[in-house]
């Protein structure tokens, strides 16, 4: 008997077949650099910076920016942002800089140039006759890179969220050490005329390069990061959610994974912790792998690890976290089962803590406390034990263990308890649910059961 086949009759004829479904045909690409070469892009001929500044500023005032010219200018302007490397800087075996080296953003990457001239038109007229200052260059670079952040804000954000962000960014780039170079609302107007900057590979690459530089190098103009910070851990929402989750419940990654009682987690956990990646290395190329073009399909996105993502946010919903209630459910990754496990884990970690005295008036008090704790431990070890050791976790006061939670789930037949459902309904019904969000899912799924 073939376990994969089913047998049935069609017009009195016995049919035996193996049901096969569509599987994910896309290969996830890991970002590790194997050839020891820095990330690279190719741009047109390097411009005269004064001419380029006037052209790009003119285009911004007219809300008509040429993406190729913008990228060429941003790459050339990197020379204005020299800083000192605080420590030897290596990533994936590549030496980026030594401690004490003077570096600029283009020290992190390779930017090749062709002989193709840019347009450098004066779309918005010619207003500036003198050469721009470094502060003016810095302001223009900051405003241009902020188009990346604005284009990453999804349409789900209601009201004037994007306009308010744009206004705050403009205020930053008209305050010292920057200088005002555009009229109010110019940034938002420019964004509306071309809203897809985050999809332009070269622009995304330059935004990631600037962000990687300013995140490590102390600099007068570090506030430029306000527009590029969204390139850090881009398309890593699954991994970022897991990191936030373990901090929230105060466990190590290893301890947390022991609570993941579902076979569908196996492939996702293997994918998230693939050896050879620099997920835990500060200032690695890994942090900006998406913008630097090191991976076309991220293995760390919410879709790539959808069961993990769903579970984490169901636990977050149980704990009443707005971020989780607003997050989008990955519908193809067993949300009903994940909501059950999320209820039990939410109950396990919600409203409980592990506490102990850590600070004392003097050394004598510390020693007395440690001696008393040692005595308690000795007494516990000497207990003749009225409970079988296998059942210890479940029946003793120590319920915060994977074994105890798993036992509770099995004793309830893999179903949520009424108290779990009431909690889910309570947090989701008091929240204005966005379409396809966890709040909407919980409301629709459990409100009739409460």
Swiss-Prot record:
Belongs to the lyssavirus nucleocapsid protein family. The gene is N. Encapsidates the genome in a ratio of one protein N per nine ribonucleotides, protecting it from nucleases. If expressed without protein P it binds non-specifically RNA and therefore can bind it's own mRNA. Interaction with protein P abolishes any non-specific RNA binding, and prevents phosphorylation. The soluble N-P complex encapsidates specifically the genomic RNA, with protein N protecting the genome like a pearl necklace. The encapsidated genomic RNA is termed the nucleocapsid (NC) and serves as template for viral transcription and replication. Keywords: Capsid protein, Helical capsid protein, Host cytoplasm, Phosphoprotein, Ribonucleoprotein, RNA-binding, Superantigen, Viral nucleoprotein, Virion. One of its GO terms (molecular function) is RNA binding. Pfam families: Rhabdo_ncap. The modification Phosphoserine is found at residue 389. Phosphorylated by host CK2. Unphosphorylated protein N seems to have a better affinity for leader viral promoter encapsidation. Phosphorylation of protein N in ribonucleocapsid may stabilize the interaction with protein P, thereby playing an important role in viral transcription/replication. This is Nucleoprotein. The keyword Transferase does not apply. The keyword Transcription does not apply. Homomultimerizes to form the nucleocapsid. Binds to viral genomic RNA. In nucleocapsid, binds protein P and thereby positions the polymerase on the template. Protein P acts as a chaperone on free protein N to prevent it from aggregation before encapsidating genomic RNA. GO terms for cellular component: helical viral capsid; host cell cytoplasm; ribonucleoprotein complex; viral nucleocapsid. It is found in: Virion; Host cytoplasm. Displays a superantigen activity in human and mouse, activating mostly V-beta-8 subtypes of T-cell receptor.
